[in-house]
Amino acid sequence: LNSSTTVFNYNKDAFRKAGLDPEKPPQTWPEVVLAAAKLKAAGVSCPFTTSWQGWTQLESFSTWHNTEFATKGNGFGGTSARLNFNSPLHVRHIENLANMAKQGLFVYRGRGNAADAPFYSGECAMATASSSTYATIKKNAKFDFGIAPLPYYPDVAGAPQNTVIGGASLWVMAGKKPDEYKGVAAFFNYLTNAEIQAKSHQRTGYLPITMASFEATEKSGFYKQNPGTDVAVNQMIRKTTDKSRGIRLGNFVQIRAIEDEELEQVWAGKKTAKEALDSAVKRGNELLVRFEAANK
């Protein structure tokens, strides 16, 4: 029920000081580079950063560009799927980020959501992150901020496509008493109530999980009163393809850890983008081979 997707947050006050239009965030990755350079020239020590680097820069990046992350429809076609995020487009993107890092335009702040706090503290001016950062930014930021769609490469056919969902799930375990299941059902019914979901979405930035809660939010005027809060929804409701409808792979938590390890080698200047992505794909595919063998 805490479902989110990836968005682009930016500091409008920092944009103003750098001579950038606060109502025109960068739409493409080349524009991100130009904006970052102007922000750095204006004295910003961390022009751009990212949280959840594997999710934002590889997984959502892939679906946003309608490009395979893995074969077999990103794993939906069976356990024989293999990773494919070392394509020329992926390598180009990570190379660009590495070049930004060398110039001080991209500053890596750590795994997971470690880059969230440097954004809402005002240290970092632009960040790719979860849409669920909305509540924390609104509560903590002492500056005017904006939410925009993920940047894309304009020369890639079909981009932008759609982003992928992230978050967590609630599971009901077997072996409990009937009365306990009645309580679980009542709780789930409460959580999925359109009014409750709409309020949660508006408060947190997590996605509304039903059309009724989305429509209630839209009807209330919330999106017009809070520009950018509909970005996550609009990125998700675009038409999907077999390359963009999501990712389903075995041992995915371990694969994400490999992504982090290899990308960190790039940011540290110890590997090229191609070396790191080739290694990540090779190591990840070894896990997928084991998963396939264990689930035949």
Locate each region found by the language model:
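Conserved C-terminal helix/tail region of periplasmic/extracytoplasmic solute-binding proteins
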Residues: 16, 22, 235-296
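Extracytoplasmic/periplasmic solute-binding protein
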Residues: 1, 6, 30-82, 124
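Extracytoplasmic/periplasmic substrate-binding proteins
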Residues: 57-60, 67, 91-183
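Short helices/loops that flank or line small-molecule/ion binding pockets
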Residues: 14-15, 33-39, 100, 113-127, ...
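Glycine-centered hinge/linker elements that transmit conformational signals in sensory
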Residues: 33-39, 78-109
